[in-house]
């Protein structure tokens, strides 16, 4: 690869990596490869583990941390997640605070590849939740939140913590 991004170091795929430390080692191998081969690394500057495990001259950072190249402020308004950058408010229909870094990483890659803000927003607009990821299913007067694809302890905890913060 020429560009690499790790959204986070979650407790997924533990069985294949021999534990959480193995997940960190395995995911960090991509950073090592990119550093050795002059690739570009997009880092979540709000994730201390990523900052500790990746040191490269070609790293670009994103996050709420003001030291990031791509800085975003997280806002909930009009039943949407909004990421405000220096020059644009990106809107997404995806629910859940835990999706902030997913959306911010997507926007950052678009900016890194010189897409315009409107082109990036168009991509966010056409994205549809499916495949058991961040889906909201209306069943009569009830809402079902379906976020079970490849569920793991980290993803389940994040999904449950958002029930009391629902804005949709």
Each model region followed by its residue ranges:
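Active-site beta-alpha connecting loops in nucleotide-dependent enzymes
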Residues: 129-132, 148-168
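Acidic, Mg2+-coordinating active-site environments of NTP-dependent enzymes
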Residues: 2-143, 165-166
């Amino acid at each position: 690869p020429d560009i690499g991004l790790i959204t986070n170091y979650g407790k997924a795929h533990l069985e294949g990596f021999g534990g959480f430390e193995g997940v960190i080692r395995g995911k960090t191998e991509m950073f090592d490869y990119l550093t050795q081969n002059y690739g570009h690394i997009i880092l979540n500057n709000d994730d201390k583990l990523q900052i500790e495990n990746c040191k490269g001259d070609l790293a670009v950072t994103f996050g709420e941390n003001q030291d990031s190249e791509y800085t975003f402020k997280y806002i909930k308004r009009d039943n949407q997640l909004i990421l405000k950058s220096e020059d644009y408010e990106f809107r997404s229909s995806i629910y859940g605070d835990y999706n902030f870094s997913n959306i911010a990483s997507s926007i950052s890659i678009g900016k890194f590849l010189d897409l315009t803000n409107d082109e990036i927003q168009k991509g966010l607009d056409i994205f549809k939740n499916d495949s058991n990821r961040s889906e909201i299913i209306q069943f009569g007067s009830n809402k079902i939140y379906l976020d079970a694809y490849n569920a793991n302890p980290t993803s389940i905890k994040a999904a449950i913590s958002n029930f009391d913060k629902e804005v949709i």
